Amino acid sequence: MSLTANDESPKPKKNALLKNLEIDDLIHSQFVRSDTNGHRTTRRLFNSDASISHRIRGSVRSDKGLNKIKKGLISQQSKLASENSSQNIVNRDNKMGAVSFPIIEPNIEVSEELKVRIKYDSIKFFNFERLISKSSVIAPLVNKNITSSGPLIGFQRRVNRLKQTWDLATENMEYPYSSDNTPFRDNDSWQWYVPYGGTIKKMKDFSTKRTLPTWEDKIKFLTFLENSKSATYINGNVSLCNHNETDQENEDRKKRKGKVPRIKNKVWFSQIEYIVLRNYEIKPWYTSPFPEHINQNKMVFICEFCLKYMTSRYTFYRHQLKCLTFKPPGNEIYRDGKLSVWEIDGRENVLYCQNLCLLAKCFINSKTLYYDVEPFIFYILTEREDTENHPYQNAAKFHFVGYFSKEKFNSNDYNLSCILTLPIYQRKGYGQFLMEFSYLLSRKESKFGTPEKPLSDLGLLTYRTFWKIKCAEVLLKLRDSARRRSNNKNEDTFQQVSLNDIAKLTGMIPTDVVFGLEQLQVLYRHKTRSLSSLDDFNYIIKIDSWNRIENIYKTWSSKNYPRVKYDKLLWEPIILGPSFGINGMMNLEPTALADEALTNETMAPVISNNTHIENYNNSRAHNKRRRRRRRSSEHKTSKLHVNNIIEPEVPATDFFEDTVSSLTEYMCDYKNTNNDRLIYQAEKRVLESIHDRKGIPRSKFSTETHWELCFTIKNSETPLGNHAARRNDTGISSLEQDEVENDVDTELYVGENAKEDEDEDEDFTLDDDIEDEQISEENDEEEDTYEEDSDDDEDGKRKGQEQDENDIESHIRKERVRKRRKITLIEDDEE
């Protein structure tokens, strides 16, 4: 329709379909006078005369010769109207097809309730066909023939194929839409073309002739498809990195050679090929039990801050813009430079810990717990990234590096249950950093620690290296302390060092200490002529060359791996309630180290058992029974004997007085703020006890012919002379006797005879128990005699004889082994 300033023109004709369309009034004209009805008031003039009446906008039609209605357009005003109201009337650009509205003058107030009805054909007004055809991509295809001398490929080939199929020439390219007023054929009837029984009378409202795609539509579709290929890589679930070609070839070769596996359980079958984390595409080593709709995708996108997993790159991009958790939940207990360690309780942050376990299962095959995270505590290692110069963000980002978890309560002194370092952060020393941090927490708790068995392949290799380096560090520390005090001591004696001393200095259990000493090739055993008792077997630490130990430690230190600093730790042991952090009741068993901690004043007190809890519960139950008897006896006073004393109910304050409260007061005592009172005092006490012990004369170890390296080979029947020439699975080799004799002065003696306090080393034994073997042999003989008496049949006798022969052979074999006195220090990894 047209908006003009001629009041004499008739009103426009109403449109049946668009009669209810209403838009806001953005068109103002000072030439439209008020109507007698006065339905809508457009504006009120400020500081105007009373004689000037309010003007009302009217939709009128001007001269047909000047203002013709164009299809899909809003006609312009007449020249006279445009000259008088150049600022207030709509400005229309025929070429661009755009409508620009004027700026409202400050002296005009527009009513908020005013609405203007503009009636137009939406299909003609929003002519998308015209807009697309004028674009820079479609216009050359419509106006120019695409031909080339060479063979056509890709998009051009598809376009020419369409032209040949439709049999169209370049010069005859016109829009082939047929008119809506095309007459019907003779055999057509009105019922087939007028739907709903003639309810919609106009043909343009129900005609479907323009819905069929034409050759121009197909060309446009192909053009848009060609231009949107780049967006499919960005927004699609496809890989954007060039991975190693050799790995891909090996996988393809395995697929061709191997048979296609049958999928028995489709729910647990994972099709995940890569995990996107921090703009890295990481190939998982093992399958993880993600939800079924996640495992059906080839790419999984994981946020490095909240560990939320997604299957769409676009969703992942939008999540990165909106995610505000730039650090893990929980408490930050350690910070040294850019490294931080966070403590997270599995009961408080269940969703985060579950996502963490699902991510860890992609790289740890032995992990079995994914959703039951309440009994565990997680320690997250992060790298801090400062964003001070960022215009929209000032908070620092903490990138996820790795983690380790441990149980809140365990009776085996496990300080680590699961450990993971992401592949993009490996070979940087973060794995050993987490291991050392776990031992630091164990030393703060005044107990030894060890990882939970069995270990994975990478975990076992990393722990062996860690134990080796820690033992080398302790030996060098003992050497330096011995040299400082060598002036006051006799040089003809050796220092007495027990495995328990090294365990206290490192926080490791004695078994792990033996592993480390074997890796350093310094643990030897001595075999005397007498085989009467276990006292004939002594174990010593023989250092062939201190330069070799120093080179091992310096080689590792030269890599500049991060080290744990004790003074950066702000943490105290967690005080667990009766449920130990979970919803179950467990019984605490006292350990030797806990008893030692209770008797030692410098060590933190440890709650060794739950006797207070049992006494408290028993007293409450006893008082309840007493009240019930009193009620049943109709409030009669009971006669109490002199010896019959009823203990009063224990209040809650007395219950917590000797357990939790005293432990809390001890932990909150920060008088010594210079260094950690527990760790440094424990090391100082151990070193002083070593120096105060009586030395062993060198004459006792003058002969060096019977000293051998301790091996981990089990059930070996080779002669003792050949043991020195063999190597075990941990890479331990024998040393020549000349090298040992040259460096006798640097020996550290370890053995049962060298213990000043025998109770310290009773928990760790390296010898076989002969009494247990004798008892087991007697039991076997009794079982054999019982079987001979009970078997009456010939088959039974024959079986009994065969068993007797086997038992005799095994008994002879055991005697041979006992004569050779093969002592197994450490069992194999598989066992």
Curated annotation (Swiss-Prot):
Description of post-translational modifications: Autoacetylation at Lys-367 is required for proper function.
Residue spans of biased composition, Acidic residues class: 736-746, 755-794
Alphabetical list of InterPro entries matching this protein: Acyl_CoA_acyltransferase, HAT_MYST-type, MYST_HAT, WH-like_DNA-bd_sf, Zf-MYST
Catalytic residues identified in the record: 452
Residues with the N6-acetyllysine modification: 367
GO terms under cellular component: chromatin; chromosome, telomeric region; NuA3 histone acetyltransferase complex; NuA3a histone acetyltransferase complex; NuA3b histone acetyltransferase complex; nucleus
Biased composition (Basic residues): 621-633
GO terms (BP aspect): DNA-templated transcription; regulation of transcription by RNA polymerase II; silent mating-type cassette heterochromatin formation; subtelomeric heterochromatin formation
Catalyzed reactions: L-lysyl-[protein] + acetyl-CoA = N(6)-acetyl-L-lysyl-[protein] + CoA + H(+)
Key words of the record: Acetylation, Acyltransferase, Chromatin regulator, Metal-binding, Nucleus, Transcription, Transcription regulation, Transferase, Zinc, Zinc-finger
Principal EC category: transferase
Zinc finger (C2HC MYST-type) residue numbers: 300-325
Location, primary (coarse class): nucleus
Protein EC: 2.3.1.48
Residue ranges of domain MYST-type HAT in the record: 267-573
Effect annotated for changing residue 319 to A: Greatly diminishes HAT activity
Binding-site positions, acetyl-CoA: 419-421, 426-432, 456
GO molecular function, one term: transcription coregulator activity
TM ranges: none
General function of this protein: Catalytic component of the NuA3 histone acetyltransferase complex, that acetylates H3K14. The NuA3 HAT complex has 2 functionally distinct forms. NuA3a binds H3K4me3, through the PHD finger of YNG1, and acetylates H3K14 at the promoter region of actively transcribed genes to promote transcription initiation. NuA3b binds H3K36me3 at the coding regions of actively transcribed genes, through the PWWP domain of PDP3, and coordinates transcription elongation. In vitro, SAS3 acetylates free histones H3 and H4. It is involved in silencing the HMR locus.
Subunit structure of this chain's protein: Component of the NuA3 histone acetyltransferase (HAT) complex. The NuA3 HAT complex has 2 functionally distinct forms that participate in transcription. The NuA3a HAT complex is composed of at least NTO1, SAS3, TAF14, YNG1 and EAF6. The NuA3b HAT complex contains an additional subunit, PDP3. SAS3 interacts with CDC68/SPT16.
Record's protein name: Histone acetyltransferase SAS3
Organism per entry: Saccharomyces cerevisiae (strain ATCC 204508 / S288c) (Baker's yeast)
Lineage: Eukaryota, Fungi, Dikarya, Ascomycota, Saccharomycotina
